[in-house]
Amino acid sequence: MNGTPNADPLASLLTLEGVPSGFAAARDGVDALLRDRGLRRTPSGLTAESLLRGAAASGELEGSTSGLETVRVDGGDEIARAAVRVSTELLGLAPLMTSRPLQAFARIHALAGRGALPDEQLGRPRDAESAGRLRALADTLVTQTEAPAMMVAAIVHADLATAAPFASHNGIVARACERLMLVARGVDEKSLLVPEAGHLRLRAEYESNLRAYANASGSTGVHAWLLYAIEAQTVAAELSPLRD
């Protein structure tokens, strides 16, 4: 990222082949879905259903053995319940994602980790390096950028998932922040997309591209992750309860 004060921290990513056009096409598809179906009928139950589907999928990616129907009936196992806890308070944190993102990260982790960690570890980074990674990400989010919102959401997700700044539940936190960023930046204000389910459907690609993001030198892994994220966001729209 460019260290010049007020410089766009994501500017270099806009030069990666296929990335700007891919996100533009994905956004067009999302906008068409939300305009053509969402604006005509958006009862709150659709948002609740999207959040539940997302929580169940995020739990599975984190290691839960409870599928959606089990979660729907009895809440599922402890990992699934952690993801559901996050989902129930998530949308109320949207304003923080563009103003005080560190507070949003902390609150999401506190919800996910409740009962699994000592209270003093809830919402707190594991160490000084992790705290630095969180601050750097937060600085990126409050700096003006020309990057499309869906790209920013993808970067937030990958940074949190690969840095693993908290003592537990980092994947759940990362996926929740991706959804929340789509809400906060106006892509999906009623949270009707299901990005977590998109990642679950593409699980092998999801996990391999996160590894590439974490381990590849230069921009190679970031480029691969962003191209993957374009596909995943398209699947997230396909899995919206608006399509039922």
Where is each model-derived feature located?
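FIC/Doc superfamily catalytic core
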Residues: 1-244
